[in-house]
UniProtKB/Swiss-Prot annotation:
It comes from Ruegeria sp. (strain TM1040). It holds the Pfam family tRNA-synt_1b. The gene is tyrS. This is Tyrosine--tRNA ligase. Residues 351-415 form the S4 RNA-binding domain. Homodimer. It is an enzyme of class 6 (ligase). Its main location: cytoplasm.
Length: 417
């Protein structure tokens, strides 16, 4: 791209690799230069925590605020009841109001780590689209809003087309999602002067619908900006690991496990991830990303420390690094490792090593645990495990034991009391 932005926000987005597409670079850039603008990203409340896959867009909101503009985090209390069909192969399970509220409460904890929700001129706002969606009159909505949408055009969006091409069912409920999301943008523009919606590139169709609707109804000029859907250099979806999703709430994933996820970054991704997930200068990100051989580990440790500090604080980052050094360099146990605590009643006369590997989160199933053992991928206190029938009793847990799956995943098992 040859466009040379005037605004700090667009310049940072381009320089650090956040941009996939924009509906009007020049128009948005000029709006951002003219004064404080308001932008939003929407989040459906489908889980009790956000995960690493959401982190790129959270960093976009953080940079938006750091460059003087107001971010809105829009909770999908209304749209979660419908479910976003974008690029999904099946319909999302429907959640009840209590579960949606609990999920929103869990997600809010994360946003407060990255954004300033004070009364400052560009203080962030947290809103819930249930505020305007729950009370909609269906017939009035069809008359006033539905008439602006072309079904032909909606069917042409890749997010819908790909599902229909596979001859997979798309319910009328899900089909309405893009209309509701478009209406969100209209309401945010009308109520709060919001001029920009951001999201992953899979949201392009939904964003464009919102822009078109707002132009038709309010005759206001607004914009859309998307980020790339990230995969790692080896093709894995960002935010997933062998153990499952990398959650951002510490009650669902310990700061140590979060730190370790970033420490395990593939060499080829270090520079790119430093630009996207930290606030280090671009020149320093490039320097660290260009390190070769064992020297690249410096970049990985800095990446892990910087990202963990943003989410969990500097003390948690230091503790995670210290635990990693204790475990990997000195062969120790480490106080900050994920820990499985068993009561005497739960342990009973003993528990199989396969059960312990599963319960500690190092394997998803007994079958996977047995495979780890048979392929020499499991260790007990740094010694290879060879017997899948091994029983662990209270005597064996007189002091905590360390279980390992491969070289990088570890957990402690201890007896309570």
């Amino acid at each position: 791209m040859t466009y040379h932005p005037k605004s700090d926000f667009i310049a940072i987005m381009m320089e650090r690799g956040f941009l996939a597409d924009c509906t009007d670079y020049q128009g948005l850039d000029e709006a951002l230069v003219s004064g404080t603008q308001t932008a939003y990203i929407g989040y459906d409340a489908t889980a009790q925590s956000l995960h690493v896959g959401h982190l790129l867009n959270i960093m976009m909101l953080r940079w938006l605020q750091k460059t003087g503009h107001r971010p809105i985090t829009l909770m999908g209390g209304g749209t979660t009841k419908v479910g976003d069909p974008s690029f999904r192969s099946d319909e999302r399970p429907l959640l009840g109001p209590e579960q949606i509220d609990a999920n929103i409460a869990g997600m809010q904890k994360v946003f407060a780590k990255y954004l300033d929700y004070s009364d400052a001129k560009n203080g962030a706002m947290m809103l819930n689209n249930a505020e305007w969606l729950d009370g909609l009159n269906y017939l009035e909505f069809l008359r006033d809003i539905g008439r602006h949408f072309s079904v032909n055009r909606m069917l042409s969006f890749e997010s819908v087309k790909s599902r229909l091409d596979r001859e997979q069912s798309l319910s009328f409920l899900e089909f309405n999602y893009m209309i509701l999301q478009a209406y969100d943008f209209l309401e945010l523009n009308r109520r709060y002067g919001c001029v920009l919606q951001m999201g992953g590139s899979d949201q392009w169709g939904n964003i464009v619908n919102g822009i078109d609707l707002t132009r038709r109804v309010l005759e206001n000029e607004i914009y859309g900006l998307t980020s790339p859907l990230l995969t790692t250099s080896d093709g894995r979806k960002m935010g997933k690991s062998q153990g499952g999703a990398i959650w951002l709430n510490d009650e669902m994933l310990s700061p140590y496990e979060f730190w370790q996820f970033w420490r395990n970054t593939t060499d080829a991704d270090v520079g790119r991830f430093l630009k996207l997930y930290t606030e280090l200068p671009v020149e320093e990100c490039d320097r660290l990303g260009a390190l070769q051989g064992s020297e690249i580990n410096e970049g990985k440790i800095i990446l892990a420390n910087e990202v963990t500090t943003l989410l969990h604080g500097a003390e948690a980052a230091r503790a995670a690094e210290a635990t990693a050094r204790e475990v990997f360099e000195k062969g120790g146990v480490g106080d900050d490792l994920p820990t499985l605590s068993l009561s005497p009643a739960e342990l009973g006369d003993g528990m199989s090593i396969v059960q312990l590997i599963v319960k500690s989160g190092l394997a998803k199933s007994g079958k996977e645990a047995k495979r780890l053992i048979s392929e020499n991928g499991a260790k007990l206190d740094d010694a290879p495990l060879t017997d899948a029938g091994l029983m662990i009793d209270a005597a064996a847990l007189a002091s905590p034991i360390k279980l390992s799956a491969g070289k990088k995943r570890h957990a402690l098992v201890q007896l309570e009391g």
